[in-house]
Regions:
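A surface-exposed partner-binding patch
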Residues: 1-103, 151-155
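Pocket-edge structural micro-motifs
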Residues: 97-98, 109, 118
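Compact, glycine/acidic-enriched structural inserts
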Residues: 121-147
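Broad, structure-driven detector of short, well-ordered beta-strand segments within folded domains
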Residues: 103-109
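Catalytic Cys-His active-site segments of thiol-dependent hydrolases/isopeptidases
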Residues: 115-121
Length: 155
């Protein structure tokens, strides 16, 4: 599991419960435990090799905090509501982290798997549904698997 720096204020179980109520979501226990330890921040190590072998390793720039923003990042609540309201991401994906290029890591709220959501490959001439499907890449079977398989950067 990575260590995170530049985290937001510590959370309580009540904070997480309020977060779930506010967004009308249910996050897995592993994600709750991670956020009780690290409320957002920058991970070290910061690389991950997706379970989909067709994908190259990815880098995680930051995890978004719950409840209180950091100096650099807004909260999951603000980011999710903004993206969902502008119909830029399916509402069944909860963005919780991003890479340095502005692409998101998201929890699928239905199957609890983790996906890499590309924002820099949006096709203005295609439907939202097409963009949603082609820009969503499976990378981990669960949040626990995701956070427990970070790897050191390769030279």
């Amino acid at each position: 599991m990575p260590e995170l720096s530049d985290c937001s204020a510590s959370l309580t179980k009540e904070d997480i419960k309020n977060f779930e109520v506010e967004l009308n979501v249910k996050i897995p226990a592993g994600m709750k435990n991670f956020y009780l330890k690290f409320n957002g921040g920058m991970p070290s190590p910061y690389c991950y090799q997706p379970q989909d072998e067709d994908l190259d390793r990815v880098e995680i720039n930051a995890f978004f905090p719950i409840k209180e923003r950091t100096n650099a990042f807004e909260t999951i609540e603000v980011i999710a509501k903004d993206i969902w309201s502008r119909n830029l991401m399916p509402c069944n994906l909860l963005p919780f982290a991003m890479d340095s290029g502005g692409n998101y890591y998201a929890l699928n709220l239905k199957n609890k798997k983790i996906y890499y959501y590309l924002t820099d490959e949006w096709d203005e001439n295609a439907s939202r549904e097409y963009n949603f499907e082609t820009n969503t890449r499976y990378i981990a079977q669960s949040f626990n698997y995701f956070i427990n398989h970070f790897i050191e950067e390769e030279e």
